[in-house]
């Protein structure tokens, strides 16, 4: 068993949301299970699952020992951009799930990392997510950093939490954006009627900020660059749909059917910048646009304007 102390400093929020935000790799559902088991206490008393925190609250969380991992190492193609004793940066292909989940028990990036790195992956994220510091969606391609030890994992997670890890994406959106650049500052939370989707909402939401700029305009479409100030689930997809420009191919937040031969959002994690946990140096990694993205641009024809 491991115990952690968590102190609330921000405004009121649900206790399960605080736990999921404060404990790397802990999901909201896992936090709710801990609450139901009485594993979260305040002043020695179990905390109820609907408790709303206030600044200054201090909680003690008892985390169970991880069960032996049943994950299988699989020798899958892995595009390694950089690797050392502390971390590995990979260029994830479109269509690959990051970690095992119901319906995707193998063939994931985690399975590939287990084969490539062996046992040298951090355990902070839990048995289902060894080494995983952050995620990108199945149909999003591009850069992702994984940690090989807990020291690196905690340091990288801290940079994500304080928004000092820079993540740059490129996307193709529907419609022609009027301005050359802009910022979407709109809170994101679970969709009120569809738990598999996210939405711009005020209820149980967290601040989300996306900075975008135009790379090229096409007839009815725009190639853009996005910088994440925060990293909420589906953030770019939700924000661009919110301002009336859903991502090309996004069947969840935009289209009802595939468009331009693309089923799944046209979104690529192009660059990643962070402080190396061991050396303290600022490191930057980039990767080229993948073939599917370049094919989409070719189908759009010549840029306009």
Where does each model-flagged region fall?
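Short alpha-helix capping/helix-loop boundary micro-motifs
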Residues: 43-48, 220-223, 258
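Methionine-biased hydrophobic packing positions in alpha-helices, especially
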Residues: 96, 196-198, 240
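Pseudouridine synthases involved in rRNA/tRNA modification
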Residues: 1-33, 78, 193, 202-209, ...
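RNA pseudouridine synthases
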Residues: 1-183, 187-192, 266, 286, ...
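Short, well-ordered beta-strand segments enriched in hydrophobic/aromatic residues
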Residues: 88, 224-227
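Thr-Gly-centered strand-to-loop micro-motif
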Residues: 42-43, 99-100, 147, 198-202, ...
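Short flexible coil/turn linkers enriched for glycine and charged/polar residues
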Residues: 84, 138-139, 165, 206, ...
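Long C-terminal interaction/binding lobes of large macromolecular proteins
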Residues: 212
């Amino acid at each position: 068993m491991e115990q952690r102390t968590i102190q609330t400093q921000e405004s009121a929020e649900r206790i399960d949301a605080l736990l999921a935000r404060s404990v790397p790799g802990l999901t909201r559902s896992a936090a709710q299970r801990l609450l139901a088991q009485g594993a979260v206490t305040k002043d020695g008393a179990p905390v109820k699952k609907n408790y709303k925190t206030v600044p200054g609250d201090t909680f003690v969380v008892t985390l169970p020992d991880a069960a032996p991992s049943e994950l299988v190492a699989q020798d899958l193609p892995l595009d390694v951009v950089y690797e050392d004793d502390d971390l590995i940066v990979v260029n994830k292909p479109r269509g690959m799930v990051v970690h095992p989940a119901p319906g995707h028990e193998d063939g994931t990036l985690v399975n590939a990392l287990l084969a490539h790195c062996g046992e040298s992956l951090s355990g902070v994220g839990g048995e289902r997510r060894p080494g995983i510091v952050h995620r990108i969606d199945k149909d999003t391609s591009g850069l992702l950093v994984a940690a090989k030890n807990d020291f690196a994992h905690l340091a990288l997670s801290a940079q994500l939490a304080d928004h000092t890890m820079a993540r740059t994406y490129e996307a193709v959106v529907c419609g022609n954006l009027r301005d050359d650049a802009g910022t979407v500052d709109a809170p994101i939370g679970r969709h009120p009627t569809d738990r598999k989707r996210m939405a711009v909402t005020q209820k149980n939401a967290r601040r989300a900020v996306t900075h975008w700029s135009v790379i090229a305009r096409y007839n009815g479409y725009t190639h853009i660059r996005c910088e994440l100030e925060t990293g909420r689930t589906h953030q770019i997809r939700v924000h661009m749909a919110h301002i009336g420009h859903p991502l090309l191919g996004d069947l969840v937040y935009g289209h009802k059917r595939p468009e331009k031969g693309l089923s799944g959002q046209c979104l690529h994690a192009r660059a990643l910048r962070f402080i190396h946990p061991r050396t303290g140096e600022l490191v930057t990694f980039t990767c080229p646009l993948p073939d599917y993205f370049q094919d989409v641009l070719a189908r759009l024809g010549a840029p306009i304007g």
